[in-house]
């Protein structure tokens, strides 16, 4: 049977309200309705889906679920029209039923935090795959299996697309999924209906305040991952204030592992700590103490923040019953993630690094990491996204001025905002803005930075990372920082 009967998608409260019909697919966009589909109608940020119920019925929708609050449909039809309270928050559960609860048949590892989500998800998938456990990923780089990811519009897809992705990967033999869980997705309840097994918290720093309003609301959104029904295990950064709060709040409900790159042991939980860190010519040697054993691993990855990410990954691998010695070996073999401290061409000088750093904290960590390896000048190319948190712009300027020797400001994704307004917001954070170059054309800025760099210099191109487009006004144009840097070399 292709599809599900309506009764299979409803809970006991709604089942008595209608006759049964076969549902072939779920849609929240009336333009995509095909005969036999279920139309799910609720008020969104831009439009109210309930205004399009008649259009969905004209396209032969088999049934309609609609948000009941402040709405009474005046439509005469034999098609089942079923009211729901808080429908937007229940779409995930409905979609999970439609796809036979795929997350229940796989180990779902949810990762939240301002920075580190993508790296941790990709590293976990690499390591589990290497150990013979077929592992999919869902996140900023797309969903699917490493090497063949499908693009998504959000870090965490909308509920129907999310459950469909789970179902596709289950069909292709996935036994585990490493999944980035954004604060937006948690706040909007996109992950309702997902059975998480392990929740990972990386760290919290300023971002998305245009959406959340303040840091406390942002923190509470991140915490929601640890409140998901059925969750049994958490992995938490003990070096972070919110991490400490999560441990205090949830240590009695969940089995928690705390990790620390600063050697901090929290006696309230099992601890994975870096007891000694030794910089190498490229990367680090790290001694670790864990509940599963003690040992040393080396990594070629740039940045002490990546040590923190690797401790989270080590914790997850051991919780997934990978033997400790094998887990350590996997850490040493992990490959860098596209757009995350990515070396453009390791065979040529100057060294050029592309990184997704688009918050003050991430930019500071990237620059600090590169300073440790820099024998000449550290040159930083960055901008800030338009239509996003304006408050972080001067903060990023202050960070760049403190840690870089030369700064070139440029466009990131200005979107509908004036590029000059964005630059002015950034410049407000500089003590000496006259020392800062401005080149709005990002390709020109990258070319200028590379050509001005001497052999021992390092150029950091920050903000866009893996992205392959640039959004200027209403145009989405092809653009790739790595490719532009290669042209400039």
UniProtKB/Swiss-Prot annotation:
Localization of this protein: Cytoplasm
Described purpose of this protein according to its UniProt entry: Catalyzes the addition of meso-diaminopimelic acid to the nucleotide precursor UDP-N-acetylmuramoyl-L-alanyl-D-glutamate (UMAG) in the biosynthesis of bacterial cell-wall peptidoglycan.
Primary localization: cytoplasm
Gene name linked to the record: murE
Enzyme Commission number(s) from the entry: 6.3.2.13
MF (Gene Ontology): ATP binding; magnesium ion binding; UDP-N-acetylmuramoylalanyl-D-glutamate-2,6-diaminopimelate ligase activity
PTM entry text: Carboxylation is probably crucial for Mg(2+) binding and, consequently, for the gamma-phosphate positioning of ATP.
Required co-factors: Mg(2+)
Listed InterPro entries: Mur-like_cat_sf, Mur_ligase_C, Mur_ligase_C_dom_sf, Mur_ligase_cen, Mur_ligase_N, MurE/MurF_N, UDP-N-AcMur-Glu-dNH2Pim_ligase
Residues where meso-2,6-diaminopimelate binds: 388, 412-415, 463, 467
GO cellular component: cytoplasm
Keywords, alphabetical: ATP-binding, Cell cycle, Cell division, Cell shape, Cell wall biogenesis/degradation, Cytoplasm, Ligase, Magnesium, Nucleotide-binding, Peptidoglycan synthesis
GO BP terms in the entry: cell division; cell wall organization; peptidoglycan biosynthetic process; regulation of cell shape
Binding-site positions, ATP: 113-119
Record's protein name: UDP-N-acetylmuramoyl-L-alanyl-D-glutamate--2,6-diaminopimelate ligase
Pfam families membership: Mur_ligase, Mur_ligase_C, Mur_ligase_M
Annotated HAMAP family: MurE (MF_00208)
Catalytically driven reaction(s): UDP-N-acetyl-alpha-D-muramoyl-L-alanyl-D-glutamate + meso-2,6-diaminopimelate + ATP = UDP-N-acetyl-alpha-D-muramoyl-L-alanyl-gamma-D-glutamyl-meso-2,6-diaminopimelate + ADP + phosphate + H(+)
């Amino acid at each position: 049977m292709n599809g599900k009967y309506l009764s299979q998608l409803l809970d006991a409260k709604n089942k008595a309200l209608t006759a049964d019909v076969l549902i072939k697919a779920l849609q929240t966009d009336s333009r995509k309705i095909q005969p036999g589909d279920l139309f799910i109608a609720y008020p969104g940020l831009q439009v109210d889906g309930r205004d399009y119920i008649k259009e969905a019925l004209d396209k032969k929708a088999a049934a309609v679920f609609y948000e009941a609050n402040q709405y009474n449909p005046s439509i005469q039809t034999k098609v089942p029209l079923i009211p729901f309270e808080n429908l937007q928050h229940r779409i995930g559960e409905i979609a999970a039923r439609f796809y036979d609860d795929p997350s229940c048949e796989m180990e779902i590892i949810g990762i939240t935090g301002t920075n580190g989500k993508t790296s941790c998800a990709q590293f976990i998938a690499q390591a589990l795959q290497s150990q013979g456990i077929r592992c999919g990923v869902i996140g900023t780089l797309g969903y699917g299996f490493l090497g063949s990811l499908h693009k998504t519009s959000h870090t965490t897809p909308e509920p129907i697309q999310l459950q469909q992705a789970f179902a596709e990967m289950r069909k292709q033999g996935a036994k585990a999924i490493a999944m980035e869980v954004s604060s937006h997705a948690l706040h909007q309840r996109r992950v309702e209906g997902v059975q998480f097994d392990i929740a990972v918290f990386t760290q919290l720093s300023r971002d998305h305040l245009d959406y959340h309003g303040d840091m406390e609301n942002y923190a509470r959104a991140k915490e929601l991952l640890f409140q998901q029904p059925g969750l049994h295990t958490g992995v938490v950064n003990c070096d972070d204030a919110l991490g400490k709060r999560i441990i205090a709040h949830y240590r009695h409900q969940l089995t928690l592992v705390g990790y620390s790159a600063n050697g901090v042991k929290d006696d309230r939980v099992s601890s994975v700590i870096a007891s000694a860190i030794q910089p190498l010519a490229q990367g680090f040697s790290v001694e670790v103490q864990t509940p599963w054993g003690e040992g040393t691993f080396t990594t070629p990855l740039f940045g002490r923040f990546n040590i923190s990410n690797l401790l989270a990954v080590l914790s997850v691998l051991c919780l997934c019953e990978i033997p400790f010695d094998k887990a350590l070996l996997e850490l040493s073999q992990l490959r860098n993630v596209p757009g995350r401290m990515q070396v453009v061409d390791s065979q040529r000088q100057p060294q050029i690094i592309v990184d997704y750093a688009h918050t003050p904290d991430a930019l500071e960590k990237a620059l600090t990491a590169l300073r440790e390896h820099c024998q000449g000048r550290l040159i930083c190319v960055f901008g800030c996204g338009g239509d996003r948190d304006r408050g972080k712009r001067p903060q990023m300027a202050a960070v760049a001025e403190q840690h870089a020797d030369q700064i070139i400001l440029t466009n990131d994704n200005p979107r509908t905002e004036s590029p000059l307004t964005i630059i002015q917001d950034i410049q407000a954070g500089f003590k000496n803005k006259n020392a800062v170059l401005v080149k709005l054309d990002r390709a020109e800025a990258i070319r200028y930075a590379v050509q001005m760099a001497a052999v021992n210099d390092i150029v950091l191109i920050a903000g866009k990372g893996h992205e392959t487009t640039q959004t200027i006004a209403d145009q989405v144009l092809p653009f790739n920082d790595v490719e532009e840097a290669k042209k400039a070399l």
